[in-house]
Curated annotation (Swiss-Prot):
The modification Phosphoserine is found at S467, S510, S523, S529, S533, S859, S898. This is FHF complex subunit HOOK-interacting protein 1B. It comes from the Eukaryota. Residues 466-493, 510-547, 573-647 are annotated as: Disordered. One of its GO terms (cellular component) is FHF complex. Pfam families: DUF5917, KELAA, RAI16-like.
Length: 973
């Protein structure tokens, strides 16, 4: 049905049923058929007298003859376009068409006119006139002309002549594409006629010819309406080829269509801006309004969307060939090196481009080859995915773009992606104590986990009715930006451009519109429950105290997010519950060794075995035979058994089976000691940190600290985060490890006070997105607060407890913390209100240069505040909420009482850079104190949503009972 709708849409875009330029069809429709036939024969008799001469060279008045033939031909074709079939015999040709077919009129006239090409004068003009006449005849004819062989023969002669070396011109190109487009529209109505245009080989051993197709290919990457019209016509041919094996084989075996598309993508990518310079520190992804304003990027996206559509409708041979060419001709030689440029700005640009491509692709086969490139292609011994994971720990801008990319990857609900990132490290269950393995599948029906998360809210962040009332500065919007931008810049309050995350805690997982997958869970904002509901606007006055009453909104959003993930994962190959897939793999084969990504395996780094690893089934279908005890895969799990490191971990107890029992006793004593420490920690956390001393963070082994340090290194020089080994050099293979992705996320979470507000929005959104997944291994790892992990494995609860302690320590050292916290909440609420009071089109669209220098900043609704070009009315609304005043204490911003002022309010110690750095540190910490409690509410709500959803997860009896939710689930072709 979608395909038919698509074809009808393309047909409606064609220039059919219109009067072509230069052709005024003022036909005397009142004339009877006999009169029209008599006039038609009279014109033809005069043309025949000219055609029967010796040729244009011998004729004294050759130019006059050419003009006369042109005029008579125009009159005849005008009459022929109005000819109708006889009512008594509707299938027979009309009288004029029957006469033209009998006389072979079109071919004789065209052959005579082509003789003039030998003179070399006016060839371009004559060719354009011929194309226009035939286009008029095809588009305006009242009868199916293409059913008749003489008409098709004349068209093929004209198309063959268009391949001769003739000086090209816009008029000639436009006429050719217009005629070809009309022919494709006519063939779409009668697909059986397509093979009649496939000419046999002119000589033995030569390839057949499909001029209708080959004349369109050179225009496939052309800019403007001409290129779009050529692509539409080619898409019609691709759809027709799906039902014609002959035409499909011709396109795949005897044309350069697929190489032209792939190499065209490479050439167009090389013209993209290598640096994306944006003034705001909240930018993190390219939106449609961004790339539409950049001609080079708009042309690339048009070609990429065309490739996506071709793979959707073309013959299977063409689909497979195009996918292979895109992988081997664009992704590997172009995108791979682009993602590993030494310049941080170029890394940011290439990562943003990749995220845009993944978000724009809808065809599973094309998306599969992009994911195969990310998961399996190696660059300098490491996969692309490992490199991207490591960059989460880099500077703020590169970190934000990388987080945005992983948000898009998780939105695909692809089993292969989640398996590579997290699940393959959790499947052996080495991260939990042996006695805790059965608890992986436990469901928290009594809300203990939710209670534990809520107990981590720092006391200093809880609402108190007697909050100090102080004059407020508008300095939150004028303070220094993220460390990744110039800290001396002054930013004013702007209006967000997309729906907010329910007015404050704004983290929109989907990117809006049709270019993103189905929205992932969005948490409600720091606003009162009814007022911040998406169905209504907030009240004019909202105080920070109301932010304590929004938990019901979190529950609604969490339920929607969990339900979406459950639906998207229903057909995964295994439930990942600690038993399926089994942690112990079957005997290792050659394909198993290839699948392992551990660096100590010493495999070939060229990545040449990707095709063999994937097999004919693509990313999801290959190398399943090594897991013989598993049922046949139904979806898209990465084929092959688990990593070699996991097998080594599982073999450790077997190798030590003959050791004395006292070792086991010592291990049990260590387990009891760790359990006692955990219980003490739980008691302290349940009291909300009210004791005289905050709970101490459990110390980590040296190996784990080194693992975290490897992902949080300085972004300059960029070398340290270009690769992400799965284990550090000093880490033993048997050491429990939850993978670099979770390690770098936890390390970034632990540094929430140092992150910018935009990084924290993206970061907490990604963790919440992971927590919504229904797999028991992942759910228990993130949300089960009673699970006892190995001493070397840090849990999310520990990370959050550490952040809580840091916030409380900061609040104790900051005398005016309550006022600063209230100021931060009011500012974010004001930013959320601007989104409701101002529509997305409230201001003129900004002009953008090719370098994206003036690209708009992301909005709060995109997880961040995208507002660089907000209208004046929105800025004034924000300034009314944040009425500036004089603050005698140490403040957060650098602004004074007027929008343009920049009066420092920090104690005058050190120089301006020191004051700005201190202001930025305080600003980030207080923003963290606003975000952190809301993140805890979100996690608590997600854990409760799992409790009412988990009993129905991956129920085989329900498989196939309904279509999956929107978004990308299975990768199987």
């Amino acid at each position: 049905m979608e395909r038919m709708n698509w074809l009808s849409r393309l047909a409606s875009r064609g220039p059919g049923h219109r009067v072509p330029q230069g052709a005024s069809l003022q036909t005397p429709v009142m004339a009877d058929p006999e009169t029209c036939l008599m006039v038609f024969k009279n014109h033809w008799s005069q043309v025949v007298r000219i055609l029967e001469r010796q040729g244009p060279r011998a004729a004294p008045g050759g130019a006059d003859d050419l003009s006369a033939v042109r005029n008579h031909t125009y009159q005849m074709l005008t009459l022929l376009a109005e000819d109708r079939a006889v009512p008594l015999v509707p299938t027979a040709p009309g009288p004029l068409l029957e006469f033209a077919l009998r006389e072979d009129l079109l071919t004789r006239v065209l052959t005579w006119q082509l003789q003039w090409d030998e003179l070399g004068d006016g060839v371009e003009e004559r060719r354009a006139e011929q194309l226009k006449l035939f286009e008029m005849l095809v588009s305006e004819a009242r009868q199916p002309l293409l059913r008749h062989g003489p008409v098709r023969e004349a068209l093929l002669i004209l198309l063959d002549a268009c391949g001769r070396p003739v000086p090209s011109s816009p008029a000639l190109d436009e006429g050719l594409v217009l005629l070809l487009s009309q022919l494709c529209v006519c063939l779409a109505r009668e697909p059986s006629l397509l093979e009649f245009f496939l000419q046999p080989p002119p000589e033995p051993g030569a390839a057949p010819r499909l001029l209708l197709f080959s004349r369109l290919v050179p225009f496939v990457h052309r800019e403007g309406t001409l290129g779009q019209q050529a692509r539409d016509a080619l898409l019609l041919l691709m759809a027709l080829s799906a039902g014609s094996p002959t035409v499909g084989c011709y396109i795949a075996d005897h044309s350069y269509f697929c190489p032209v598309l792939a190499t065209g993508l490479s050439a167009l990518y090389s013209s993209l801006p290598r640096k994306i310079e944006v003034p705001g520190d909240d930018w993190h992804c390219l939106r449609r309004e961004d790339w539409l304003g950049v001609p080079a990027l708009a042309l690339f996206m048009s070609s990429l969307e065309f490739c996506n559509a071709v793979i959707q409708v073309a013959h299977p041979l063409v689909q497979k060939q195009l996918v292979d060419y895109i992988h081997n001709g664009f992704l590997v030689p172009v995108m791979g090196p682009a993602l590993h440029k030494t310049s941080v700005e170029e890394m940011i640009a290439s990562t943003a481009y990749l995220e845009l491509f993944l978000r724009s692709i809808s065809e599973p086969a094309l998306l599969r080859t992009f994911l195969r490139f990310l998961l399996l292609h190696r660059h300098d011994t490491h996969t692309i995915l490992d490199t991207l994971v490591a960059r989460i720990g880099s500077n703020s801008r590169l970190c934000m773009v990388s987080l945005s990319l992983f948000r898009t990857l998780l939105n695909l609900s692809c089993e292969d992606v989640l398996l590579q990132l997290v699940l393959r490290y959790l499947v052996p269950c080495n991260h939990v104590m042996l006695s805790q393995k059965p608890a992986v599948r436990d469901v928290d029906l009594y809300g203990r986990a939710a209670d534990k998360f809520l107990s981590l809210i720092p006391r200093c962040c809880r609402h108190h009715a007697s909050s100090p009332s102080r004059p407020e500065h508008a300095s939150w919007a004028r303070g220094p930006g993220s460390p990744s931008v110039d800290s001396s810049s002054v930013v004013t309050v702007h209006r967000p451009s997309t729906p907010s995350r329910l007015a404050l805690f704004l983290r929109q997982q989907s990117l809006g519109g049709s270019e993103s997958p189905a929205p992932a869970p969005r948490s409600p904002g720091l606003a009162t429950s009814p007022a911040s509901s998406p169905g209504r606007r907030p009240s004019p006055v909202e105080e920070p105290g109301e932010l304590e009453d929004n938990y019901l909104e979190y529950l609604r959003e969490a339920r929607r997010g969990v339900d979406r993930c459950v639906q998207a994962c229903r057909t995964w190959s295994a439930p990942y519950d600690g038993e399926r897939p089994p942690p112990e793999p079957s005997p290792v084969g050659s394909r198993t060794k290839k699948r392992s990504l551990l660096p100590e395996e010493g495999r070939d780094n060229a990545g040449g075995g990707e095709e063999e690893e994937l097999g004919s089934g693509g990313l999801a279908g290959g190398a399943r035979e090594s897991l013989g005890h598993l049922p046949p895969p139904q979806l898209n799990g990465l084929p092959g058994p688990w990593p070699e490191g996991a097998k080594k971990v599982r073999r450790v107890p077997k190798e030590g089976a003959g050791e004395p029992l006292e070792d086991t006793s010592e291990g049990m004593a260590g387990l009891e000691g760790f359990g006692q420490e955990l219980r003490e920690l739980e008691v302290a956390l349940s009291n909300g940190g009210a004791g005289s001393e905050p709970p101490l963070e459990p110390s980590l082994p040296l190996e784990e600290e080194e693992a975290y340090e490897s992902f949080t290194c300085s972004p300059e020089p960029p070398g340290p985060f270009l690769s992400s080994p799965l284990r550090t050099l000093n880490q033993l293979p048997s050491q429990p490890f939850t993978g670099p992705f979770m390690a770098v996320l936890f390390a970034k979470l632990e540094n929430m006070l140092q992150n910018s507000v935009y990084v924290n929005f993206l970061l907490t959104g990604l963790v919440a997105q992971l927590a919504c997944h229904p797999q028991p291994l992942l759910r228990s790892f993130l949300l089960n607060t009673n699970m006892v992990f190995q001493p070397s494995v840090k849990s999310l609860l520990q990370v959050l407890g550490s952040v809580k302690n840091k916030i409380e320590s900061f609040a104790a050292s900051q005398e005016d913390f309550p006022a600063l916290l209230s100021k931060a909440k009011k500012y974010l609420i004001a930013r959320g209100k601007l989104d409701w009071t101002e529509g997305p089109a409230a201001g003129p669209a900004p002009r953008r240069s090719d370098s994206l220098v003036k690209s708009r900043r992301p909005s709060l609704g995109e997880l961040l505040l995208r507002h660089a070009h907000s209208p004046t009315r929105a800025r004034q609304a924000a300034q009314m909420v944040l009425q500036p005043g004089r603050d005698g204490g140490a403040g957060l911003g650098l602004g004074g009482g007027s929008p343009g002022a920049s009066t420092p309010v920090l104690p005058a110690r050190g120089g301006a850079p020191e004051r700005q750095g201190e202001a930025l540190r305080v600003k980030n910490a207080v923003y963290c104190a606003v975000i952190f409690p809301e993140f805890l509410k979100e996690l608590a709500a997600i854990s409760q949503a799992h409790a009412v959803t988990s009993p129905f997860l991956l129920d085989t009896s329900e498989e196939g009972s309904g279509p999956p939710v929107s978004g990308f689930g299975p990768l199987n072709p």
